[in-house]
């Protein structure tokens, strides 16, 4: 009995010794409350974004289309560069099961179906389950791969750290420079335009600091 009373007294003292919550009238509390609601809304939209696009995957390949209107095919510079990596990033925060299963499987499928020249991906048609273009056009492949690395795979790697998506980026970079077609006095370049070479500069510099591979600054200085 005495032990029970002593326990009750300790509980009462503990409860009343807890600092009081600032309450709804505190500016800091109100700001924190607004921040919490805004964060919740943002995360809810991200969650619906992931599942919304997954609902429109090609039922055969499991890849996502370029858009939901006229482009029922996968491509590197849109489907891959601007959409899929951010589904992965959002799922890493909001749906770990989806991140570990479906979204990882999509990468393996992408590599298996869309690699056209070594690790360089090309447009993949869902209606035929074949490449959209009958012939390899190197500038298209290098542009798509460069956009995918800079816009999608690099931000994903900077958030998650080294993953299989990092391996995908390194593989594409290797193939870009293996097949670089533009002759210059300092050696081959991937392209003669500022967009592709700009993509390359942004990716090469960051890859060097991640890996220490001396080829990356050498290629960047060549550009």
Where would I find each of the regions flagged by the language model?
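Bacterial N-terminal signal peptides
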Residues: 8-17
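Bacterial N-terminal signal peptides that target proteins for export
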Residues: 1-9
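Glycan-recognition and catalytic cores of secretory/periplasmic carbohydrate-active enzymes
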Residues: 22-223
């Amino acid at each position: 009995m005495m032990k029970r009373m002593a326990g009750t007294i300790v509980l009462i003292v503990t409860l009343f010794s807890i600092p009081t919550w600032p309450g709804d009238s505190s500016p800091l509390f109100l700001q924190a409350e607004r921040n919490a609601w805004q964060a919740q809304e943002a995360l809810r939209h991200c969650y619906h974004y992931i599942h919304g696009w997954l609902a429109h995957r090609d039922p055969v390949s499991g890849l996502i289309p370029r858009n939901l209107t006229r482009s029922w095919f996968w491509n590197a510079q849109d489907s891959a560069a601007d959409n899929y990596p951010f589904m992965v990033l959002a799922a890493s925060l909001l749906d770990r099961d989806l991140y570990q299963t479906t979204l990882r499987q999509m990468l393996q499928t992408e590599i298996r179906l869309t690699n056209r020249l070594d690790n360089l991906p090309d447009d993949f048609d869902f209606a035929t389950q074949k490449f959209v273009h009958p012939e390899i056009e190197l500038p298209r492949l290098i542009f798509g791969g460069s956009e995918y690395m800079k816009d999608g795979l690099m931000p994903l790697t900077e958030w998650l750290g080294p993953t299989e998506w990092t391996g995908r980026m390194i593989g594409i970079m290797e193939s870009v420079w293996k097949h670089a077609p533009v002759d210059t006095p300092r050696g081959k370049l991937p392209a003669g335009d500022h967009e592709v070479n700009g993509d390359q500069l942004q990716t090469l510099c960051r890859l060097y600091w991640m890996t220490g591979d001396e080829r990356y600054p050498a290629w960047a200085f060549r550009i």
